[in-house]
Amino acid sequence: MNLETIIGLEVHVELKTNSKIFSASPTEFGAEPNTQTSVIDLGYPGVLPTLNKEAVNFAMKAAMALNCEIATETKFDRKNYFYPDNPKAYQISQFDKPIGENGWIEIEVDGKKKRIGITRLHLEEDAGKSTHTADGSLVDYNRQGMPLIEIVSEPDMRTPEEAYAYLEKLKSIIQYTGVSDCKMEEGSLRCDANISLRPVGQEKFGTKAELKNLNSFTYVQKGLEFEQARQEKELLSGGIIQQETRRYDEATKKTILMRVKEGSDDYRYFPEPDLVELYIDDEWKEAVRASIPELPDARKARYVAELGLPAYDAHVLTLTKEMSDFFEATVADGADAKLTSNWLMGEVLAYLNKQQKELKDVALTPAGLSKMVQLIEKGTISSKIAKKVFNELIEKGGDPEEIVKAKGLVQISDEGTLRKVVTEILDNNEQSIEDFKNGKDRAIGFLVGQIMKATKGQANPPLVNKILLEEINKR
């Protein structure tokens, strides 16, 4: 029996508003526990919520960027459940009239493009955060009432790799709109995954498992891979899959049962009586649409068409708005686009990944990188020497020209000076000359290495190769 995997994702994104969705409480991350709450957040008797218009604008902006249809009439509903981090015993969410529906994004996996549908995007308030210790449980209500959008995908993904690509693309689009920073480590982007298997050709979905505790895109993929293998083994051995909620354990790299679901959750939704229905007219929609900046796909296409970048470079550079904006500023300052791309995708990304930092955390600036790239273009420094300059720039900042002068790193491009060095190296390595003339190409590499060593890496490589071949041919 051949089985097909069905995956759908539910993504919660915290909106970057200055105040909460139904109160004036601040939304700053990292504040002392329970210092950013109000009587509205905590559900005191007699208090009334007031809808934050900016949260609605942000939700519409995200929905439009995800190609959703925007509702003309929408409303809020009470989702009833009891849990310690939910002080009102209900959550204000949206049930049957979400703000956005029928959207899609396009992903690419192994060179193949695929459209993933988005069922709905709705607004809701976040719950508090529980922390469990050996002595008991603690609740921080700072997060209670934070504005969220929940983005529910269609079950269109067939592999964990597609799920990873979907999340990467979704995060990129949301970041470009500016409505959220999408930092998983701070909880401003969270994901639950639903996965089931069915025989190939069968239309009815199999019994799904819901995966939680997915703290990174990599863990989403790994959790889905494990669950895919677990369900496949169970089904092929004649077993049945129960509807379960499971969590991904980072230590064992397995999914672990949290609870078995005997039926669907009954949250007893009913319209929120303290908030009127919201009417979104065409003028409001168009005002929000006009505020949407250039999105990653459009920027990627522009890099290929106008700057002549390879599609791969354009894809990597536009994955995050921070990297793309940095690239644009560097090129606008006069640097060559392809050379800038090479440095950002190579040395810069390698440094950031190793140090677990973002561009905003380092001393490197677009102006600094641009000057360094232009020094390479002019032949003032070689790419090898540029790495020494780069290390200084990203750690301490500064002016590349001043760094080159202070460290004596100017590339030697004087032909007379280099010819003298080349002649001296050849005089001391006659065997290498013979080897090269006898067809041993590696001998030329040895000679170039000796020349670079003698000049402390400052010789102009193309000029060295030219002079070296000329001098060998004379002998």
From Swiss-Prot:
SUPFAM superfamilies per UniProt: GatB/YqeY motif, Glutamine synthetase/guanido kinase
Keyword terms, alphabetized: ATP-binding, Ligase, Nucleotide-binding, Protein biosynthesis
Top-level division of the source organism's lineage: Bacteria
UniProt key word Protease: no
InterPro entries: Asn/Gln-tRNA_amidoTrfase_suB/E, Asn/Gln-tRNA_Trfase_suB/E_cat, Asn/Gln_amidotransferase, Asn/Gln_tRNA_amidoTrase-B-like, GatB, GatB_C_1, GatB_Yqey_C_2, Gln-tRNA_amidoTrfase_suB_CS
SMART domains: GatB_Yqey (SM00845)
Signal peptide: none
PROSITE patterns in the record: GATB
Listed GO MF terms: asparaginyl-tRNA synthase (glutamine-hydrolyzing) activity; ATP binding; glutaminyl-tRNA synthase (glutamine-hydrolyzing) activity
The keyword Cell division is assigned to this record: no
Function: Allows the formation of correctly charged Asn-tRNA(Asn) or Gln-tRNA(Gln) through the transamidation of misacylated Asp-tRNA(Asn) or Glu-tRNA(Gln) in organisms which lack either or both of asparaginyl-tRNA or glutaminyl-tRNA synthetases. The reaction takes place in the presence of glutamine and ATP through an activated phospho-Asp-tRNA(Asn) or phospho-Glu-tRNA(Gln).
Subunit comment: Heterotrimer of A, B and C subunits.
Family: Belongs to the GatB/GatE family. GatB subfamily.
Protein name: Aspartyl/glutamyl-tRNA(Asn/Gln) amidotransferase subunit B
Originating species: Bacillus cereus (strain AH187)
